[in-house]
Amino acid sequence: MANLERTFIAIKPDGVQRGLVGEIIKRFEQKGFRLVAMKFLRASEEHLKQHYIDLKDRPFFPGLVKYMNSGPVVAMVWEGLNVVKTGRVMLGETNPADSKPGTIRGDFCIQVGRNIIHGSDSVKSAEKEISLWFKPEELVDYKSCAHDWVYE
């Protein structure tokens, strides 16, 4: 199947604290994507610095790491046709003020510093992020019984 790919999605501490984990998972499942891996953890500062290494020179970097370390996160891997691009559309813009209603950030966020969710921005970054957060044996390979009802 063309463009069957995986993406990394993380529900940030504010999304966990606000009780949005189930709603976010529901949206990805209802879209037809397949959950491949999930863990609930409090990421270390070092782990977060590695995750956000591309932003290390930005003025908001220390605050971002502190915010992401302030509570537990839900790290997930989702698989599906064009899941990276479609997942980003489902999330909405990084700045919730620019997000359309119906997107996760458009429906549940107000400020960019509390935008509840992270999603890989490319297939390449998804591969990097997945390998940073999950060991290969933690990725569960199975065929969803819904697969044939989602894909031609």
Curated annotation (Swiss-Prot):
Question: Which GO MF terms does the UniProt record name?
Answer: ATP binding; DNA binding; G-quadruplex DNA binding; GDP binding; identical protein binding; metal ion binding; nucleoside diphosphate kinase activity; protein histidine kinase activity
Compartments reported by the entry:
Cytoplasm; Cell projection, Lamellipodium; Cell projection, Ruffle
Keywords for this entry? Answer: Activator, ATP-binding, Cell projection, Cytoplasm, DNA-binding, Kinase, Magnesium, Metal-binding, Nucleotide metabolism, Nucleotide-binding, Nucleus, Transcription, Transcription regulation, Transferase
Q: Which residues form the active site?
A: 118 (pros-phosphohistidine intermediate)
Write down the required cofactor(s): Mg(2+)
Which reactions appear under catalytic activity for this entry?
Answer: a 2'-deoxyribonucleoside 5'-diphosphate + ATP = a 2'-deoxyribonucleoside 5'-triphosphate + ADP; a ribonucleoside 5'-diphosphate + ATP = a ribonucleoside 5'-triphosphate + ADP; ATP + protein L-histidine = ADP + protein N-phospho-L-histidine
What EC identifiers does the entry list? 2.7.4.6, 2.7.13.3
Q: List the PROSITE patterns hit by this protein, alphabetically.
A: NDPK, NDPK_LIKE
A GO biological process of this protein is:
regulation of epidermis development
Which SMART domains does the protein's record reference?
Answer: NDK
Task: Name the principal localization, coarsely classed.
Answer: cytoplasm
Q: Where does ATP bind?
A: 12, 60, 88, 94, 105, 115
Q: Which CDD domains match?
A: NDPk_I (cd04413)
Q: InterPro entries recorded for this chain? A: NDK-like_dom (IPR034907), NDK-like_dom_sf (IPR036850), Nucleoside_diP_kinase (IPR001564), Nucleoside_diP_kinase_AS (IPR023005)
GO CC terms? cell periphery; cytoplasm; cytosol; extracellular exosome; extracellular region; ficolin-1-rich granule lumen; lamellipodium; nucleus
What ranges does the record give for the region Interaction with AKAP13, renumbered to this chain? Answer: 1-66
| Listed transmembrane segments | none
Record note on quaternary structure? Hexamer of two different chains: A and B (A6, A5B, A4B2, A3B3, A2B4, AB5, B6). Interacts with CAPN8. Interacts with AKAP13. Interacts with ITGB1BP1 (via C-terminal domain region). Interacts with BCL2L10.
- Protein family membership: Belongs to the NDK family.
Which HAMAP family does the protein's record reference?
NDP_kinase
Q: What does this protein do?
A: Major role in the synthesis of nucleoside triphosphates other than ATP. The ATP gamma phosphate is transferred to the NDP beta phosphate via a ping-pong mechanism, using a phosphorylated active-site intermediate. Negatively regulates Rho activity by interacting with AKAP13/LBC. Acts as a transcriptional activator of the MYC gene; binds DNA non-specifically. Binds to both single-stranded guanine- and cytosine-rich strands within the nuclease hypersensitive element (NHE) III(1) region of the MYC gene promoter. Does not bind to duplex NHE III(1).
Q: Which PANTHER family match?
A: NUCLEOSIDE DIPHOSPHATE KINASE
Name by which UniProt lists this protein: Nucleoside diphosphate kinase B
- What organism, scientifically named, is this protein from? Homo sapiens
| Encoding gene per record | NME2
